[in-house]
């Protein structure tokens, strides 16, 4: 009997493990559209809302277009059931990290969305790439932030630390290009057209209603 107990325990453990993975698979089996469930990444899902994490580079024209067209349409489609969060992830060579730090600081001051819009406009519509103090002052007027408080935040080094954490996250999940989109922290989307994202997001919301 004693010789069989380890085997019995192993068998029970395997059954439980299979059951656990089966349950996890069933949780996503109802989703529609093209997506990839990322192994080992925790879900950051909030019931009744889908969060789109976009690993993006402000200097990337594809990121600018994705934000301007696809994210805007998704926000109009789903309203408060959808949230977009940009994760600064530099990939364009020869660019300073200043804009990413500016964005991170604006997020802490409650103006991340507006800062994101203005930075994309300055870079892609006005062809401004050097964000020294003079240019930052113009940006801050557009965004509506106090210059002294903002500059103090930049000087603290915290926005740069946030950028480092974002880069580590992106490297961990093997982000190699921008934009890279992850829904709710663990659902990777490679087909970034509006129709596919709409289908996947809607199916997540439908799953919430049924649960």
For the regions a language model picked out, list residue spans one by one:
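N-terminal secretory signal peptides that target proteins for export/translocation
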Residues: 1-6
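Extracytoplasmic thiol/disulfide redox context detector
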Residues: 7-93, 167, 171-172, 206-211
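C-terminal cap of thioredoxin/glutaredoxin-like
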Residues: 28, 57, 141-211
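Solvent-exposed, acidic/flexible segments
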Residues: 48-49, 63-67, 92-99, 108, ...
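Sec/Tat-exported extracytoplasmic proteins
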Residues: 59, 70, 74-78, 106-110, ...
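Extracytoplasmic/secreted envelope proteins and their assembly/folding machinery
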Residues: 68-75, 99-103, 116, 133, ...
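Structural microenvironment flanking redox-active thiols in thiol-disulfide oxidoreductases
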Residues: 77-108, 113-140
């Amino acid at each position: 009997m004693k010789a069989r107990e380890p085997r019995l325990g192993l068998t029970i453990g395997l059954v439980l493990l299979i059951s656990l993975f089966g349950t996890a698979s069933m949780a996503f089996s109802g989703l529609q559209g093209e997506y990839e469930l990322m192994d080992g990444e925790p879900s950051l899902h909030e019931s009744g809302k889908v969060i789109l994490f976009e690993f993006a580079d402000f200097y990337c024209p594809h990121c600018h277009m994705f934000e301007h067209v696809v994210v805007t349409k998704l926000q109009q489609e789903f309203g408060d059931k959808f949230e977009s969060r940009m994760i600064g992830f530099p990939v364009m060579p020869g660019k300073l990290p200043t804009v990413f730090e500016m964005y991170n600081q604006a997020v802490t001051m409650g103006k991340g969305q507006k800062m994101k819009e203005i930075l994309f406009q300055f870079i892609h519509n006005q062809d401004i790439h050097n964000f020294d103090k003079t240019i930052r002052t113009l940006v801050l007027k557009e965004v509506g932030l106090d210059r002294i408080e903002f500059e103090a935040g930049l000087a603290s080094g915290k926005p740069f630390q946030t950028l480092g954490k974002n880069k580590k996250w992106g490297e961990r999940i093997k982000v190699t290009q921008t934009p890279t989109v992850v829904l709710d922290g663990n659902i990777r989307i490679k087909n970034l057209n509006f129709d596919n994202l709409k289908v996947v997001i809607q199916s997540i919301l439908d799953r919430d209603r049924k649960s």
